[in-house]
Amino acid sequence: MGFLHVGQDGLELPTSGDPPASASQSAGITGVSHRTQPPCFEGLTSKDLVREEKTRKRKRKAKESGMALLQGLLTFRDVAIEFSQEEWKCLDPAQRTLYRDVMLENYRNLVSLDTSSKCMMKMFSSTGQGNTEVVHTGTLQIHASHHIGDTCFQEIEKDIHDFVFQWQENETNGHEALMTKTKKLMSSTERHDQRHAGNKPIKNELGSSFHSHLPEVHIFHPEGKIGNQVEKAINDAFSVSASQRISCRPKTRISNKYRNNFLQSSLLTQKREVHTREKSFQRNESGKAFNGSSLLKKHQIIHLGDKQYKCDVCGKDFHQKRYLACHRCHTGENPYTCNECGKTFSHNSALLVHKAIHTGEKPYKCNECGKVFNQQSNLARHHRVHTGEKPYKCEECDKVFSRKSHLERHRRIHTGEKPYKCKVCDKAFRRDSHLAQHTVIHTGEKPYKCNECGKTFVQNSSLVMHKVIHTGEKRYKCNECGKVFNHKSNLACHRRLHTGEKPYKCNECGKVFNRKSNLERHHRLHTGKKS
């Protein structure tokens, strides 16, 4: 034997006029004996030659091993029909052509399977006579293009082992239904034209890249009876261990449209599970998975930093269109309304936070002091009281603050901005709280009342300070002299005696004072006003 060569150089078949390579020239699978056949086969048809060769091979194997083919696993070469140099010369052109077609068909069926792992294949003849079972195991190396006359077996990708079997089965009826995947052979001229046209490999349905050179193949999955029924179980006589016997599903059945041979493949060394609902689109930067490619593309914009949607008013950019739609600060639109108090919000998230006021729910608790909050942001802000962290710094005077809002309010001192204006007297204020306090002057309202003496106050802070009179509590102590005060502001004024600080300056004469009340009293000298 020496005709079929499956190894580093793939499948080699001679042209119709060339004799096959000798056994000594064949590389690949070991353990195959070589012989010389009678010199002439004249008068025999090609079918007779094939049948006689098969019979001779079975008898020889049975004699050597004491059993028929079921003794152990066989290789492709063990079951191949091969001829010596003398035998090949005796074949006429029609017989040689038929032989090449048969061998090429078997090779096509092989490369259609996952040849990187061990495969168990059963081939059945549709003639109903002399059904043969063929078992093959091994790894097939496929690479360079090989020509057989005008037909070219172009480069087949090595990643055949990346096949992912995804079949749908109807277990209720156990029938088979036809699914077609057409891959036609190309002539040398067609292959040459496509190469220069820059055609890329066609992505095979099973997950591996192929050039369009495969024959027309019919793929079946269980839904109807077509041809001979292929057994699901693997015979124990094929030396397969219990750990290797896995389910015949997923299975592959391949048939050429000109023959009714079926190949059944069961992966013995590697299970491959296909989850139809698993998230198959994955982003390398973050490892995040998505159900669809469109979601993946949206997520990729975050990594690319691409913000395609821009506000025409302020120029702010957004990753997605829906974020731009939620950007309603310019329109003043507040589509979300609280059912309890009727207050409106521009974002649904703000409404959800607001609802906690009505429910009284405060799920966020400080581990240091046990104080609870209705928002996580408020808890994070509160933590800075314990840590002393002040991450917000004024660029003008380097003063630091624990809250961003405090920094923004402080900046108005440097800019002179007073955005809050009284509608009655047009007086402006830096803080909205100051405007609220000022408005009470015009209304005369004093909503805060002391329960001890009945005195009323414009501001709640004034009421708190007043209550100290009744309790006699003096919580604020000077670290320099030990003097205590009932108000924090009084302690602050007292400290200036130790530091010598006089922050209040008269714009008329430049005189400085350590208290604001002293500066106001001094102003009356210039204006002539009497208290």
Swiss-Prot record:
Return the Polar residues bias intervals: 22-36
Q: Which UniProt keywords apply?
A: DNA-binding, Isopeptide bond, Metal-binding, Nucleus, Repeat, Transcription, Transcription regulation, Ubl conjugation, Zinc, Zinc-finger
Record family assignment: Belongs to the krueppel C2H2-type zinc-finger protein family.
What Gene Ontology terms for biological process does this UniProt record contain?
Answer: regulation of transcription by RNA polymerase II
GO cellular component terms, alphabetically, are:
nucleus
Annotated region described as Disordered, given as residue ranges: 1-42
Q: Describe, by residue range, where the zinc fingers (C2H2-type) fall in the chain.
A: 281-303, 309-330, 336-358, 364-386, 392-414, 420-442, 448-470, 476-498, 504-526
Glycyl lysine isopeptide (Lys-Gly) (interchain with G-Cter in SUMO2) cross-link, renumbered residues: K271
Q: What PANTHER family has UniProt attached to this entry?
A: ZINC FINGER PROTEIN, ZINC FINGER PROTEIN 383
Designated name of the protein: Zinc finger protein 701
Give a single Pfam family match: zf-C2H2
| Listed transmembrane segments | none
Query: What cystine linkages occur within this chain?
Result: none
**Molecular functions per Gene Ontology:** DNA-binding transcription factor activity, RNA polymerase II-specific; RNA polymerase II cis-regulatory region sequence-specific DNA binding; zinc ion binding
Q: Cellular location of this protein?
A: Nucleus
Q: What does this protein do?
A: May be involved in transcriptional regulation.
In terms of superkingdom, the source organism counts as Eukaryota
Per the database entry, which stretches of residues form a coiled coil? Answer: none
Q: Which ranges carry the KRAB domain?
A: 74-146
